[in-house]
Amino acid sequence: MGLRATSLHALRLAGLLAGLWAGNAAAISGNEQVSLAGTGQFEQLVSALEKQAASEPMKVADWHALCYSYFRIKRYDKIFSCLDQLDKALVARDKRTRLFGLDDATPTSLLMRAETFVEIAQYSAAIDQAQRAIDWYTKDGESEKDILAQALAVQAIAYKNLGKPDLAQQAAQKLEATQVNAYTDLAIGAKSLALARVNMALGRWQKALDALASDKTLGLRAFVDNITSGAFLKGLNNWVWLELPRGYMQTKAQFELGDIDRARAGFDKLLDVPQLAANGEIYWMVLSDRALIASKDGDDAKAIAFYRKALDVIERQRASINTEANKIGFIGDKQDVYARLVALLFKTSKFSDAFEVIERAKSRALVDLLASKSSFAPPRAAREEKLDIVEILGQQGRYDAALGQQSEAVLRSFAGGNAPRENTLKLALPAELQSLVSVSALTEAEIQKLLSPDEALLSYFANGNSMYAMVITKDSTFGTAINAEGLENDVRRLRASLAKRLPVETQLKQLHTRLLAPVESQIKQRRLSIVAHGALHYLPFAALFDGQQYLAEKYSLRMLPSASVLKYLRPARTNDFKAVLMMGNPDLKNPAMDLPGAQLEAQALAKDLAGSKLLLRADASRKAFIEFAPQSQLVHVASHGEFDATNALSSGLLLAPDGATPGRLTVSDVYQLALDAEMVTLSACETGLGRIASGDDVVSFTRGFLYAGTSSVMASLWQVDDDSTTFMMTRFYQHLRTMGRGEALRNAQADTRAKFAHPYFWASFYLTGAY
């Protein structure tokens, strides 16, 4: 069954494959449902049950089977609404299920919600749902200790991921104290797996092994089930779905404990199991760990091959957020696979290959960010072709899931009956949308074709204490490793010094020495596009200082979320803006949040820019933005901004509310807009000085406006003094009349620097998108 089944009801696998309850015939019979689920064909089960739901009433057992199938294939767009239907059915109908042969589906609904919340990093909600399952156990199901074990495991893992180790430890102790008889209690298997998951999450590898070993009757139960279900006579093993995650956890623990020989043999044995390929999350982790061992063995070629295969498995799946990995408590970081492969490719001087993997990693990060989002505004090409973007996203997700299950029949059904092709659905998407829903990084050669002769691209890729910098020009590629130890703290200290307007020249010079000096000899061009990564998203590159000049004095700069976005940027058509939306100092119903300087800024700029629609205070609302921004060539917003490092799509601009409707314009909202703006300027926004996170929040906000149809976005890394901001914005728009956007920003920064010398005043603004 795979990791999900073991997470919910490991000891009821026999009930899944052999135990059916008597009931009336359905559109798809109970036997067929059990057979499809037991063989992992969840896409086919979903298809059949969705047709049934559209044509006739569904029993609790049917809703449970459908929800569980969504749960298995990561249909985040449908799982919660399905569970809502299941909960409604549970109020008035027979509560029994076919899958797992449960008398009451209530706790499984709660646990599926809890597990899904963990997957999408909503840990507080996961803890709440798990507690409701515990409450159900206390009230109605004290014999159902597997429910208690799984709920406590969810809480322990969620608390750990929330950074609350004491509460995680408390949940782990409650789980460990749960009394089960090692030889007679059917919940021993559930407790064993739950303890193993928790101990892996907490990095307690020996305890994870001990937990797995505590289930002393697994072999006997598997043998009995294979006999009673008839699998033995067919040469099948129903329990391979339980044995795979147990085998992975055991081998992973051995590896982490330094037993490399046993781990190597264990991973090789797992790779020989045909069903492993149908469990994508475990599959990529096995491949990644096997690559690590090959690397330790000194076999770089084999390690590279394993890593490439792991990436193929990862990228075949629809974007997901730590799916199976959370279920065993070990957060298998997909980005580590990219980073380790990049390190090996650098080691073997395969810089072109390394660059492409770096681009795939950054593309994947964006896919993961958008994984749980199902509503997008069509990009320009899609609007013209009248494509149903949400439906295409759903088709792409189902197709990717089918690929992950390795089911030829399902693949053929999505490929129109022909042999499956990975790009069948992807080819139906506009290029702009392809970059959002699939890993479609450009190659080095494709990037070089997009660069102008006077432009260089500088791309960084960070992972832990390792960092790699690559310079790509029209006709050359250069790469080098950089020591990133302490870099995040250096950026944090710089930001703190900037906020206090302390002397920063020494810090800026040190950062220049670390980040630019190793590559600057390769940069002969005047224009420089920088692709930051990690903490570097919060670094004001314009202010880096070589002892003589700031970087902004030497180059016309722009920031890009990835090099591959070059293909999708809309070129600047004009800087002579005829329709301007100017919003400033929205009334947030809190005097402490007023920005009188932003209001003066908006008023001054509106006078200088013909055709401006000026909206201030209560008029500067979210509703007004959504109404007027699509009609504007230039959108300038001078307001507060809040960036959520834990949930980038919730980051937003604080605009005036409309009655009871909040005024927050989120990144998620931006992805649903249909703009045709030449430029969006976000003035007075701040990411929060001193806070360094993954950087995805900064990327996602600017990329959201690019996706919505904006050619260029100018934003700030921190809130700046009112006078200097107004001065700089005025100079920027004046320079735009005679030069490109990158040069206009560079010259506006120079003008501001002459009047306000400290980098705090002039270095916060950066350009993304078209020059």
Please state what every model-predicted region is.
Residues 436-771:
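Catalytic cores of enzymes
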Residues 51-57, 88-103, 135-146, 177-185, ...:
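Flexible helix-coil transition and linker loops at the boundaries of alpha-helical arrays
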Residues 190, 239-245, 268, 284-285, ...:
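Amphipathic alpha-helical protein-protein interaction segments
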Residues 25-65, 104-105:
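N-terminal leader/linker segments that initiate helical-solenoid repeat arrays
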Residues 31, 65, 105, 112, ...:
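"A position-specific structural signal for the A-helix of alpha-solenoid helical repeats
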